[in-house]
Amino acid sequence: MATLPEFTDVQAAYERIKAHVTQTPVVTSSLLNAWLGHTVLFKAECLQRTGSFKLRGATNFLHHYCQTHGLPEKIVANSSGNHAQAIAYAGSMLNIPVDIYSTES
């Protein structure tokens, strides 16, 4: 069973990715706040370089992997969406060739 991350793990991940991802804004909706009677905050990850939050995880994983195991020869992933875009972008930042496979639908 995996262990839960500690705050120091979150800080380390932030340090690994901060130069490679966009610092996206937190926004709110006055209409939704009024309807719910509470303040609701949204993290606008749609403004990220690849259009989703997945870039944060892909960048963190690849940087951590490279720090602990060295640069891989190639990255192979299976995805047809945001994960594929994130892996491809993160791989290109590190000059690692990336092969993305996607199923036909």
Question: What positions do the PLM features span?
Answer:
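PLP-dependent amino-acid enzyme catalytic core
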Residues: 1-105
